[in-house]
């Protein structure tokens, strides 16, 4: 059944913001580089971080897994391609979208924007947009970089180059502010991506994590492992009173009592804090995250 962490679940969900801040700092340890306008190019850049964090960020401690994968997906002669693929699969199997909820810098950035006091809009009627991120993953991360390669077999990072707003936020903006030569070289591509960043910022104020829900290919990849990952959500049906408070609290539009490990669940723990009977918690173990469902279904059928 796996090991349950009821007390730890409450603590983790309560201090999630601090965990996100710590993860962002660890992902970007080289803060003085923001003033220097240079990049860290040490051994750490050969290691992929779990969340969406631009390689070109002056403070970046490691490589972005999506960017690294796009560069080498088109050729099996790069051993690095096997490493990146293996790391992504391992992270997915171990944590699933827990990474989105706790360890991703850009996810945290969107959440901070959403805290700005203004009218908030629901995304419940926009659920079909969820599938866009899978198209982005398939086309811009897998297919185009795999088939459109240069003479040495390296693909163009289409997602990073044409769509990723994190690259502008962490890379282009700070580097251009510190380097006049880079400022002079900015062109229409920067304008396009800066417009995307502005759109994400505005939407993040109104909607909860719109980029994560609709466009992020890394979230789409981890979502594929949500139902089979080692770290999961668990619902104790004997404790659940079907009050619906967990579903109402979920900003990812998931009903944890129906699908504890839905692909959209980022394991943020909002449902854990909302549950009046402590029926929801984190667990480590493989399975569907439900307990005593047979007994309940039998009783309900009487």
Segments (PLM) and residue ranges:
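Non-ligating segments of multi-cofactor redox enzymes
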Residues: 1-257, 263-302
């Amino acid at each position: 059944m796996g090991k349950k962490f009821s007390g730890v679940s409450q603590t983790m969900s309560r201090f999630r913001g601090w965990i996100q801040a710590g993860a962002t700092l660890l992902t970007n340890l080289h803060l003085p580089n923001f003033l220097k306008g240079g990049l860290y190019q040490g051994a750490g850049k050969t290691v992929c971080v779990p969340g969406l964090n631009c390689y070109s960020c002056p403070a970046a401690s490691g490589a972005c897994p999506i960017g690294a994968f796009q560069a080498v997906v088109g050729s099996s002669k790069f051993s690095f391609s096997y490493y990146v693929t293996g790391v992504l699969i391992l992270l997915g199997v171990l944590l699933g979208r827990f990474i989105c909820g706790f360890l991703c810098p850009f996810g945290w950035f969107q959440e901070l924007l959403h805290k700005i006091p203004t009218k908030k809009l629901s995304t419940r009627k926009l659920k079909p947009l969820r599938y866009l991120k899978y198209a982005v993953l398939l086309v811009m991360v897998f297919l185009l970089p795999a088939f459109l390669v240069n003479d040495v077999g390296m693909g163009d990072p289409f997602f990073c180059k044409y769509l990723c707003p994190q690259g502008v936020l962490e890379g282009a903006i700070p580097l251009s502010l510190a380097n006049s030569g880079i400022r002079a070289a900015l062109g229409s591509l920067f304008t396009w991506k800066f417009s995307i960043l502005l759109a994400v910022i505005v939407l993040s104020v109104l909607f909860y994590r719109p980029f994560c829900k609709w466009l992020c290919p890394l979230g789409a990849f981890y979502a594929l492992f949500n139902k089979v990952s080692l770290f999961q959500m668990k619902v104790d049906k004997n404790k659940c009173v079907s009050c619906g408070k967990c579903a109402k609290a979920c900003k990812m539009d998931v009903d944890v009592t129906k699908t504890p490990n839905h692909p959209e669940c980022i394991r943020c723990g909002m449902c854990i804090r909302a549950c009046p009977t402590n029926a929801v918690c984190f667990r480590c173990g493989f399975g569907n995250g439900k307990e005593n469902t047979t007994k309940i279904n039998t009783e309900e059928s009487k």
